[in-house]
């Protein structure tokens, strides 16, 4: 029997996105990145110089570079290694300073990365929120109604070892880049269909039109100005209100923000004056932008508040904020050995806000494969963040959150455990005392859905769980949940009820009959 294959689906013909202006070019050759696996000749030379033959060989055998390719650029290398960086004309970009251990920990491979590869290939189940249409599948993320994220670039000018987009770099899960025309047409088509349906989706649920675009990757700012302009033009043609660009270039290579890039932004603004541009920076540690003396201390400004910034970093922020149609916000994860100190987080927030960059989020590191080498326990991170916010005004503060499958979950509080004082213990019935201490004895953690996917019915919903000081992600609390907004309304207290029943039955073990009885009562 002869099998006849179906003809491939043809792509719909799209209106080609035309660029009708001359986009200026940036010259970034002097700060070009170096990327590669350990067999790349320049990478292997650097690894041998830093680690020596024995440790480098151990990392090769452990497959550290297979987990993630190494990437660095001259600016960030100078900071990590304590080197001076100059332009071809002799201008000092990075002065000679002590090597920055936090920056080295952020960018340099670690042997322990592959010691435990537990974690998710697609953290937070992002592919669940891509478009179902084959044409757009894996090219965008539409998790929240009013904003669409498009993968504009597949790479960065350096590689954070804790990156949660490993699957995009390694092509593991189906994520891939989107063309400007596709991004534009998806938004226009979605909004048109929504309007035709009276603001409701195919299931009759209330939905909101797309008003914002987030260009992500990788890092969109590694693209040439012309390519980046095409994405910004696509956003303008899609009639969105706010164009957001997520980028670590201001930390990795602030020289990227040159006159040509600023002129490119102005060209976009001239065509779409009502479209605001919001660049979300990824500053992770103050060493990325502050000058340090020979003793590794930050240098105070002589005639004003705060500390001295490195010249390229200062110029980059100032030139962007001189544009009245643009704003800067910052978000970054908390990473072990990088920025997991109160001082680092406090100075990061204070200095960014002083310069006009609004702190937005400090994230719990995502549960990527190998995350145990980078993640700080959730409750430890909350404590560091909480103490770091002391002495900062409300405009200088960020939220400590984890970006989960169920949205951005803010860690609202960690409450210490409760034990009855000796003088009260005898006044409370034993059964009640046991139940209360079973629930509250270890303490509790409160999470809040600051951003919930799609419609906002579950916005600000709570998850309340018994503490787990070792937990690195919300998954570490799933068997300890007392109240859960993610469940159906009549099931949200099931964890609490189950625990009360087990306590009342006098069983703390794993007796299957007791567990089933408790779950039946909870249901």
Language-model regions: role of each:
Residues 2-142:
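Flexible, acidic/Gly-rich N-terminal and inter-domain linker regions that tether
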Residues 144, 166-213, 230:
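Conserved alpha-helical substructure of the radical SAM core
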Residues 53-56, 81-101, 114-137, 189-209, ...:
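Intrinsically disordered, low-complexity coil segments
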Residues 76, 160, 360:
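Conserved, mostly hydrophobic/aromatic
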Residues 136-139, 149-151, 185-186:
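Catalytic micro-motifs at enzyme active sites that drive phosphoryl/nucleotidyl and oxygen chemistry
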Residues 191-203, 208-210, 218-392:
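Conserved AdoMet/S-adenosylmethionine-binding subsite of the radical SAM
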Residues 142-179, 245:
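Canonical Radical SAM [4Fe-4S] cluster-binding loop centered on the CxxxCxxC motif
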Residues 385-523:
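C-terminal accessory regions of radical SAM enzymes
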């Amino acid at each position: 029997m002869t099998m006849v294959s179906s003809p491939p689906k043809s792509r719909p013909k799209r209106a080609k996105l035309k660029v009708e202006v001359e986009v200026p070019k940036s010259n970034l050759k002097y700060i070009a990145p170096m990327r590669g696996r350990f067999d790349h000749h320049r990478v292997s030379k650097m690894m041998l110089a830093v680690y020596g033959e024995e440790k480098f060989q151990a990392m090769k055998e452990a497959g550290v570079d297979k987990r993630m390719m190494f990437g660095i650029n001259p600016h960030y290398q100078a900071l990590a290694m304590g080197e001076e960086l100059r332009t071809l004309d002799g201008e000092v970009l990075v002065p000679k300073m002590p090597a920055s251990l936090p920056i080295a920990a952020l960018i340099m491979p670690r042997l322990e990365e592959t010691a435990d590869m537990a974690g998710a290939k697609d953290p937070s189940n992002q592919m669940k929120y891509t478009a179902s249409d084959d044409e757009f599948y894996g090219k965008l993320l539409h998790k929240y109604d009013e904003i669409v994220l498009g993968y504009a670039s597949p790479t960065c000018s350096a590689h954070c070892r804790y990156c949660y987009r490993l699957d995009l770099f390694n092509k593991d899960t189906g994520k891939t880049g989107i063309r400007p025309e596709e991004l534009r047409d998806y938004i226009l088509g979605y909004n048109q269909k929504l309007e035709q349906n009276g603001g409701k989706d195919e299931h009759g649920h209330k939905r909101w039109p797309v008003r914002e675009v987030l260009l992500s990757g990788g890092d969109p700012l590694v693209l040439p100005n012309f390519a980046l302009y095409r994405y910004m033009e696509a956003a303008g043609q899609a009639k969105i209100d706010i164009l957001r660009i997520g980028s670590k270039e201001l930390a990795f290579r602030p020289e990227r923000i040159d006159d040509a890039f600023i002129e490119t932004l102005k060209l976009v603004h001239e065509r779409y004056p009502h479209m605001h541009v919001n660049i979300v920076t990824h500053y992770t540690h103050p060493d990325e932008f502050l000058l340090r003396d020979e003793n590794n201390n930050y240098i105070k400004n002589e005639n004003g508040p705060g500390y001295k910034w490195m010249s390229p970093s200062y110029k980059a922020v100032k030139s962007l904020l001189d544009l009245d149609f643009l704003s800067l916000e910052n978000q970054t994860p908390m990473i072990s050995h990088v920025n997991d100190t109160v001082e680092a987080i406090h100075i990061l927030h204070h200095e960014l806000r002083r310069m006009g960059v609004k702190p937005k989020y400090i994230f719990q590191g995502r549960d990527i494969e190998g995350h145990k080498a980078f993640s700080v326990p959730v409750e430890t991170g909350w404590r560091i963040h909480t103490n770091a916010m002391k002495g900062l005004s409300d405009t200088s503060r960020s939220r400590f959150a984890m970006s989960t499958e169920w949205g951005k979950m803010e860690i609202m509080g960690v409450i210490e455990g409760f034990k009855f004082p000796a003088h009260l213990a005898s006044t409370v019935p034993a059964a009640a005392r046991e139940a209360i201490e079973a629930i509250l004895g270890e303490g509790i953690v409160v999470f809040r859905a600051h951003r919930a996917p799609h419609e906002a019915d579950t916005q600000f919903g709570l998850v309340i769980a018994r503490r787990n000081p070792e937990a690195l992600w919300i998954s570490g609390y799933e068997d300890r949940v007392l109240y859960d907004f993610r469940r159906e309304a009549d099931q949200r207290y099931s964890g609490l009820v189950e625990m009360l029943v087990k306590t009342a039955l006098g069983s703390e073990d794993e007796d299957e009959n007791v567990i089933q009885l408790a779950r039946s009562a909870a249901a």
